[in-house]
Amino acid sequence: MQQTPLFKNHYFHQLPGFYTALQPTPLHGARLLYHSEGLASELGLSSDWFTPEQDDVWSGTRLLPGMEPLAQVYSGHQFGSWAGQLGDGRGILLGEQQLADGRSMDWHLKGAGLTPYSRMGDGRAVLRSAIREFLASEAMHHLGIPTTRALTIVTSQHPVQREQEEKGAMLLRVAESHVRFGHFEHFYYRREPEKVRQLVEYVIARHWPQWENDERRYELWFGDVVERTARLITHWQAVGFSHGVMNTDNMSILGLTIDYGPYGFLDAYQPDFICNHSDHRGRYAFDNQPAVGLWNLHRLGQALSGLMDTDTLERALARYEPALMQHYGTLMRAKLGLFTASPDDNDVLVGLLRLMQKEGSDYTRTFRLLADSEKQASRSPLRDEFIDRAAFDSWFATYRQRLMQEDQDDEERRRLMNATNPKYILRNYLAQMAIERAESDDTSALARLHQALCRPFDEQPDSHDLAALPPDWGKHLEISCSS
């Protein structure tokens, strides 16, 4: 029996003046193209919800009981400069689904049409960008990285003009909250300190209720936001993920990865990798992400300066670097198969990364193959991946000595490393092939890639081709902010 999900909209009722209430604008010929069965199950939605009879739900044409759609207003810094009001220019928060375990989840429809905050945009999304966000959301979730999720992709016959004409689409994004750093900045720069305070109180009550009545709640909360952001970015660095557009309006207050645009996972290890071809100065290059994260937190701290004094803000911000280093060290040791800490661990890691950078070694493949090394063997199967084998042998001798300090035998260490180092990541060329097929209404490549990304650490013998290195045409795909 099909059970209708229960909705409320706390944001609608508790934060008047923070949004505009409005309905989604229909897309011509809209229909459900694809959905996440795993997320649907987590949300308690049966397969009956994903039949053609329900297309009007996923396109926002038919609202479910309790939905009260609205467009949130927020501002932000783009590429280091204050940009003023930025959105939400094409996304509508439909409502908050109330789950059986007591949590609530935003249903946010991206590409839902013009809002009062659209500026020069058309309020639409294209199928290409919807598929890229869907796949990235699923990939990151199954890699264990905090992220928004994506439930459905809707395609249409509605033409949308970008660099060329493309199919209009909608994506239903699911998250515990869509509040961004830019929400707080918006009211700070409008000189509305009471609204900043109101938003902070709302967020604490909804997501940090343990501190709701604590006199130090602002400091405790902001310190936790700082640490969540640090941990998120260490996850990105460890898995080789480059976000591409770390503007303050693209930073989640919950420490989730949000707004997948011109992102990319590292192929060859290239610390200064720039995935966004609009980022001409490399502000959001892969190796600059930790520094940008802290810069963005300083902008958030500035927006909160009416609630906390300078010493309190600086105390909270000072938690960033220790959290970053501690968490990054833990994640990277695990990638190396080191489960205790030693003073020399950073030298072992840096030695391998330098070799990889020098030779352009594939980031994901190198760490995955490293698990097949044995303590007692003088050579590693990974050796054949390097041209300068003498340099690799020198590094491997140091690595073997470090492995001797670990308690795990080779089989146990291999198992633990393979549960940390994925075999399957979302390479841009794989996404592009799935997009091209889906634009012709063939979702078979999308489904196959999605299924592999849901089990990134498993061998999956039938999917080995999806772990292949990019072909020449797929090595330098240019991805822009256009979506």
Swiss-Prot record:
It catalyses: L-seryl-[protein] + ATP = 3-O-(5'-adenylyl)-L-seryl-[protein] + diphosphate; L-threonyl-[protein] + ATP = 3-O-(5'-adenylyl)-L-threonyl-[protein] + diphosphate; L-tyrosyl-[protein] + ATP = O-(5'-adenylyl)-L-tyrosyl-[protein] + diphosphate; L-histidyl-[protein] + UTP = N(tele)-(5'-uridylyl)-L-histidyl-[protein] + diphosphate. The active site is at 249 (proton acceptor). It comes from the Bacteria. Its EC number is 2.7.7.-, 2.7.7.108. Keywords: ATP-binding, Magnesium, Manganese, Metal-binding, Nucleotide-binding, Nucleotidyltransferase, Transferase. Mg(2+) binds at residues 250, 259. Pfam families: SelO. The keyword Phosphoprotein does not apply. GO terms for molecular function: AMPylase activity; ATP binding; magnesium ion binding. Its cofactor is Mg(2+); Mn(2+). ATP binds at residues 87, 89-90, 110, 122-123, 173, 180, 259. InterPro entries: SelO. Nucleotidyltransferase involved in the post-translational modification of proteins. It can catalyze the addition of adenosine monophosphate (AMP) or uridine monophosphate (UMP) to a protein, resulting in modifications known as AMPylation and UMPylation. Belongs to the SELO family. PANTHER family: PROTEIN ADENYLYLTRANSFERASE SELO, MITOCHONDRIAL (PTHR32057:SF14). This is Protein nucleotidyltransferase YdiU. It comes from Pectobacterium atrosepticum (strain SCRI 1043 / ATCC BAA-672) (Erwinia carotovora subsp. atroseptica). The lineage of its organism: Bacteria, Pseudomonadati, Pseudomonadota, Gammaproteobacteria, Enterobacterales.
